[in-house]
Amino acid sequence: MDTIAARALTVMRACATLQEARIVLEANVMEILGIAINRYNGLTLRGVTMRPTSLAQRNEMFFMCLDMMLSAAGINVGPISPDYTQHMATIGVLATPEIPFTTEAANEIARVTGETSTWGPARQPYGFFLETEETFQPGRWFMRAAQAATAVVCGPDMIQVSLNAGARGDVQQIFQGRNDPMMIYLVWRRIENFAMAQGNSQQTQAGVTVSVGGVDMRAGRIIAWDGQAALHVRNPTQQNAMVQIQVVFYISMDKTLNQYPALTAEIFNVYSFRDHTWHGLRTAIRNRTTLPNMLPPIFPPNDRDSILTLLLLSTLADVYTVLRPEFAMHGVNPMPWPLTAAIARAAYV
């Protein structure tokens, strides 16, 4: 299936080079399009030309690219347009070994297949405590009953520890059971002035320490912590104290947008509004997948089919921009011109 996807990507990118009718095509583009169009026309009985000039010819070439995108992604889109019917035989065209594919396309498909079939340490973009159900007011003293040191979450990436005079305690428990981190990068600081429960202000005296595995760590410096070693806070002074511990970032095996080069840009290209026809087409294709149909996914996609579909659909979007096809979509009304941000915004409502 990797070679089928690589051929589809190669042919669509070759079609995206047809910026004007009399352009001098590169030799590899002529070879790719010549073989692909010949095989496609023979199996589907369409009339795609290598140099589309009229609207009908541009539509035919775009429909060929649409067929190839859907076949490579394994999508049966169904009846979406009175002007277009999906040709299931296109998979046979893409399976033809005579159609060459570029090194770039093959490498990209190999990266998608390789990265989605395994896991690796990745820097996570969200706060470590993002999914906590409660939070406490920053800089305000809080002590639980029968404790001398209390750690609480005070933000999506931060905790604070309240300590009685002369108290000490381990606070690693508040990190455990969350996000399955491989490494957490912390910075701790003294809260110079904090509010007691009665509202009066109090100062944290110098001498408060935070240690990892028994080794004192300097305040204001990034600490690499595995989440398992004892994270110990100590207040040797004769007054109450508070410290702040911030998670700068953490690494886990969860997939991110860095698993594939330019995945963020590909997602933006797919979900961008070009006109109502493209908006309806993208939505119809997305409805046959597990990805959102109108707005980008909340969390990074982590399976091969989703990322491959995004890559193929982003390339189809480029072809749509170049060929400027015009065809009807079921349930889609023509858009007013000129295109404005307000018109584009309204399409997502």
UniProtKB/Swiss-Prot annotation:
One of its GO terms (molecular function) is host cell surface receptor binding. GO terms for cellular component: viral envelope; viral outer capsid. The keyword Glycoprotein applies. Keywords: Capsid protein, Glycoprotein, Outer capsid protein, Virion. One of its GO terms (biological process) is fusion of virus membrane with host plasma membrane. The keyword Glycoprotein applies. Transmembrane segments: none annotated. It is found in: Virion. Glycans are attached at residue 287. Belongs to the orbivirus VP7 family. Homotrimer that assemble in a complex of 260 capsomers on an inner scaffold composed of VP3. The VP7 protein is one of the five proteins (with VP1, VP3, VP4, and VP6) which form the inner capsid of the virus. This is Core protein VP7. It comes from Bluetongue virus 1 (isolate South Africa). The lineage of its organism: Viruses, Riboviria, Orthornavirae, Duplornaviricota, Resentoviricetes. The gene is Segment-7.
